Amino acid sequence: MADAKTIKIEQIGSPIRRHRSQRSTLIGLKLNKIGRVTELPDTPAVRGMITKVHHLVRIVDEK
């Protein structure tokens, strides 16, 4: 697993006035403040979470 792909995402939107599931998804992605950047493994589960909150996050870098 030395060549494990990662994806870097940044939170660009606020979870205020969003559904509880979207707020929980942001927490699951380790995001809790606008401007925060996190690096996660590029798996189908993480991609699905990003799709769920695509209006609140942006992909910074894919390795």
Swiss-Prot record:
Sample GO molecular function, one term: structural constituent of ribosome
InterPro entries, per the entry: Ribo_uL30_ferredoxin-like_sf, Ribosomal_uL30_bac-type, Ribosomal_uL30_ferredoxin-like
Alphabetized UniProt keyword annotations: Ribonucleoprotein, Ribosomal protein
GO biological process terms held by the UniProt record: translation
Entry similarity comment: Belongs to the universal ribosomal protein uL30 family.
Subunit structure comment from the entry: Part of the 50S ribosomal subunit.
Protein name in the entry: Large ribosomal subunit protein uL30
Organism listed in the record: Bradyrhizobium sp. (strain ORS 278)
